[in-house]
From Swiss-Prot:
The lineage of its organism: Eukaryota, Fungi, Dikarya, Ascomycota, Taphrinomycotina. It is found in: Nucleus. Residues 119-153, 174-206, 335-387 are annotated as: Disordered. This is Postreplication repair E3 ubiquitin-protein ligase rad18. It holds the Pfam family zf-C3HC4_2. It comes from Schizosaccharomyces pombe (strain 972 / ATCC 24843) (Fission yeast). A zinc finger (UBZ4-type) spans 156-183. Residues 122-131 have a biased composition (Acidic residues). E3 RING-finger protein, member of the UBC2/RAD6 epistasis group. Associates to the E2 ubiquitin conjugating enzyme ubc2/rad6 to form the ubc2-rad18 ubiquitin ligase complex involved in postreplicative repair (PRR) of damaged DNA. Transmembrane segments: none annotated. Residues 240-274 form the SAP domain. GO terms for cellular component: chromatin; nucleus; Rad6-Rad18 complex.
């Protein structure tokens, strides 16, 4: 199946087995709602895409499904689910075409008498044909041979290594010899061949690429050898609060990433790159570094459009023109506030200067002068001169 094909679990509603919708949904990520890509399982047994869960845990340290506490270091690869998904994606188009309900035109209903007559006539003819066919020895022998072939085919199973039909009681010996041999036997060397090409008899008629699936599954056990050791080292996270802007910029420069922008932009760029790089290591077929850088640039472009402010217009003349009225209003408010404050201080100073004060700083109180009595004049006038 092509990765660009848009599929949805509701596609199975118009097939002969609508319950396959549940199987299709269980193979999709709860975050991006697409088929798992490098699935990782959490400590609470939930599975997500490697990139989706790493990007989510960067902002929310919890499981998106059950909200349980989770850390990126606890994530583990879900290899068996990835193999099941690869097989399902191969057979999905053929399975969908096989189970698709065809729009067959409804037959025109006839009169009841005619229908009954035709049914009875056809029934009599079929009964006579059955009697004639069953009575001949050749037909009996043919039927016996057909039944024996059917039973013989039911006793056969597919070898998971070479996809050949092998009797079920000999599958263990055949599997040992098939895996130990330097080259697996080809499907043409098997004495049993699937000759049933009819789509209506069995699901074994699907033309799937079993050999390629088997090879990918066998290679999964040696997935550690797919990348060199130096390319499989995961990038550590950084504590940006302890790093200066120049240090973060140098880290990005060492990785060959853009170094323009302010510190917050550099932090987001580095964090996104760590998520992209580490999730790419979980892929069976990791993409190149150039592809990852292109994804990072596309992500930054989308982020800048969502904010609605272009980088080159920050602090420019367009910004001043757009908010000129707001700036003028803020300036007027600041001037008015300063004027009111100065008037208040001036009035307070005038009031304090008009009040008399003592040396100790407190206002002076009005005190009447002391009463003085001239004792000399009063004493002379009353007694007179003495001789």
């Amino acid at each position: 199946m092509n990765e660009l094909d848009a599929t949805d679990p509701s596609d199975w509603n118009q097939t002969k087995i609508p319950s396959l919708k549940g199987l299709d949904s269980s193979l999709r990520c709860l975050i991006c709602h697409e088929y798992f890509r490098a699935p990782l399982i959490t400590s609470c047994s939930h599975t997500f895409c490697s990139f989706c869960i790493r990007d989510y845990l960067r902002e929310h340290p919890m499981c998106p499904a059950c909200r349980a506490p989770e850390q990126e270091s606890r994530l583990r690869k879900n290899t068996i689910l990835e193999e099941i998904l690869e097989s399902f994606k191969v057979i999905r188009p053929t399975l969908f075409e096989f189970l698709k309900v065809e729009n067959v035109p409804k037959p025109v209903l006839q009169a009841p008498e005619t229908v009954i007559a035709q049914d009875s006539a056809s029934g009599d003819e079929e009964w006579e044909d059955d009697l004639a066919s069953n009575s001949s020895p050749a037909s009996i022998a043919k039927k016996t041979s057909r039944d024996s072939k059917k039973r013989k085919r039911e006793d056969l199973v597919h070898c998971p290594a070479c996809s050949n039909l092998v009797p079920h009681n000999q599958i263990n010996q055949h599997l040992d010899s098939c895996l130990n041999s330097p080259s697996s036997p080809s499907s043409s060397s098997s004495p049993y061949k699937n000759k049933d090409n009819s789509k209506s008899n069995s699901l074994l008629s699907f033309k799937t690429d079993d050999d390629s699936i088997t090879k990918r599954r066998l290679r999964s056990f040696n997935s550690a050898d797919e990348l060199p050791l130096k390319d499989r080292v995961r990038l550590p996270k950084l504590t940006y609060a302890l790093l200066s802007e120049s240090k973060i910029r140098s880290k990005l420069s060492e990785m060959g990433l853009p170094t323009d922008g302010h510190k917050q932009l550099l932090q987001r760029r580095h964090a996104k790159w760590v998520t992209l790089y580490n999730s790419n290591l979980d892929q069976k077929q990791p993409v190149s570094k150039r592809n990852l850088i292109r994804q990072l640039i596309d992500w930054e472009r989308v982020q800048s459009k969502s904010i609605g402010v272009e980088k080159e217009k920050l602090g420019g003349g367009d910004w001043e023109k757009a908010y000129a009225e707001d700036f003028a209003d803020l300036i007027n408010r600041a001037k008015q506030s300063t004027t009111n404050k100065n008037d208040s201080l001036r009035n307070t100073a005038v009031e304090s200067s008009t009040e008399p004060s003592t040396s100790n700083g407190f206002p002076a109180t009005s005190v009447s002068p002391p009463l003085t009595i001239d004792l000399t004049n009063s004493q002379t006038g009353s007694d007179g001169p003495q001789s």
